[in-house]
């Protein structure tokens, strides 16, 4: 699979594939694969075992790079230890990775409980005390936002603040979730009909479509070439 992806670097319609554009996207580049010792060390440090399909990807395809949307965030090791190079718009917390991924019902309950505690200005003696209370409440939202993806890896940025997460703990382990919270949406499982979608099918589906588009171009490109 690694060779299939890297071969697309020379495809004639490379820049028509979303997220692959030179200078702005992954350009069908891949990080080197990790060794078994490196993957094991990452799992031990992070306190989780990676789902098998993602683990195989790290070992055989690459630590990150070309993939759906703007690519797969690379898993790297530096003075900070093992972490994903996620970019400036992501705020995932690896300290939460070993915790159970919350259910939809749990996430909804947490939101409802926090909303019910929103400070109301008439309840405070002055504007300063109200703003202090509101600031503390808003900080709780930041914590809740992170808690909602406990037990999941942020894999990919879809653009516009939307992300794809891979669950690594609990009953949903191995399932991908789409994060639509940037537009006041929710975390939703990625599905194909009635079935949850895991890493392997997600990546292979992307590769099939990306290869076709990169090599053949869109209908608009074909029409331009006929003129």
Residue ranges and their predicted role:
Residues 1-154:
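A surface-exposed partner-binding patch
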Residues 11, 78, 93, 175, ...:
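Small/flexible residues
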Residues 64-68, 72, 171-173, 182-184, ...:
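Generic alpha-helical propensity signal that fires on short helical segments
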Residues 74-76, 178, 187-189:
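Short, intrinsically disordered/low-complexity patches at protein termini
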Residues 82-84, 110, 137, 141, ...:
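A residue-identity detector for tryptophan
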Residues 154, 162-186:
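Low-complexity, glycine/alanine/valine/leucine- and proline-rich hydrophobic stretches
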Residues 184-227:
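Long, compositionally biased interface segments
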């Amino acid at each position: 699979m690694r060779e299939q992806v890297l071969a697309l670097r020379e495809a004639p319609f490379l820049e028509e594939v979303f997220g692959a554009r030179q200078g702005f996207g992954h350009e069908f580049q891949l990080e080197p694969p990790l060794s078994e010792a490196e993957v094991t060390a990452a799992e031990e440090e992070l306190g989780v075992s990676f789902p098998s399909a993602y683990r195989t990807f790290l070992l055989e395809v690459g630590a990150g790079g070309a993939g759906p949307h703007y690519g797969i965030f690379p898993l790297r090791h530096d003075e900070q230890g093992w972490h994903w190079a996620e970019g400036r718009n992501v705020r995932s917390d690896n300290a939460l990775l070993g915790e159970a991924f919350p259910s939809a019902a749990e996430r909804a309950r947490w939101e409802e409980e926090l909303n019910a505690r929103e400070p109301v200005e008439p309840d405070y003696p002055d504007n300063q005390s109200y703003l202090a209370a509101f600031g503390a409440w808003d900080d709780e939202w930041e914590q809740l936002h992170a808690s909602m993806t406990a037990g999941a890896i942020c894999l990919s940025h879809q653009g516009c603040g939307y992300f794809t997460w891979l669950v690594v703990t609990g009953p949903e382990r191995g399932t991908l979730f789409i994060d639509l919270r940037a537009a006041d949406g929710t975390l939703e499982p990625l599905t194909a009909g009635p079935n949850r979608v895991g890493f392997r099918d997600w990546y292979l589906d992307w590769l099939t479509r990306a290869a076709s588009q990169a090599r053949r171009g869109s209908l608009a490109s074909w029409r331009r070439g006929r003129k």
